[in-house]
Amino acid sequence: MDCDGRMVKAIRTGVNVLDFRRWPITVCINTKWNLIYLMQKSFQTRMATIVVQTEINSSLDKAWEIISDIDNEPKFWKGTKEVKTLSTEGDIIKREITIAFRDQKCLQEIQLKPKKEISAKFIKGILNGTKIITLTPNKEHITMETVWEIKLSGMMNMFTGVIKNHIKSGTEQAMQSIKKEIER
């Protein structure tokens, strides 16, 4: 590949040049696996958005007590196998989580906003994006909402759409487990 973004066949004939500058694709090189592949530009930035809500009949204090215990995440979230807190700086918690998908490790930054929200940002690993859990008190109940803006990193990016339904069903199951625990 030369500096103008053209890929030249191994045997240069002067004619066999593909010009990708105006195509909606990117030439990607994976040095670990010695692969050259083409990726549609729309796949590179496509995030899966998942929104799940549930109503909880409980006090805000009790709901916050359960969801803010982030070390207990594997108890409710079946996609999270293990969590390990690495450091705490102010209201930011850095931790390593092991997810159920091929026991992959991801680095997260968690920010707790007491009795309002938990924001988890995936900063390294197979997942990129955020998971935000919000508590909104109403007169009779509390609305708990989880919003994912997520995609798979690297070459796995093309499978983001495939795993969206899997993450959504896991989130629905987790929300029901959390609701059951809070309402006990």
Model feature map: region roles:
Residues 74, 84-127, 143, 173-184:
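Glycine-rich portal/gate segments that line the openings of hydrophobic small-molecule binding cavities
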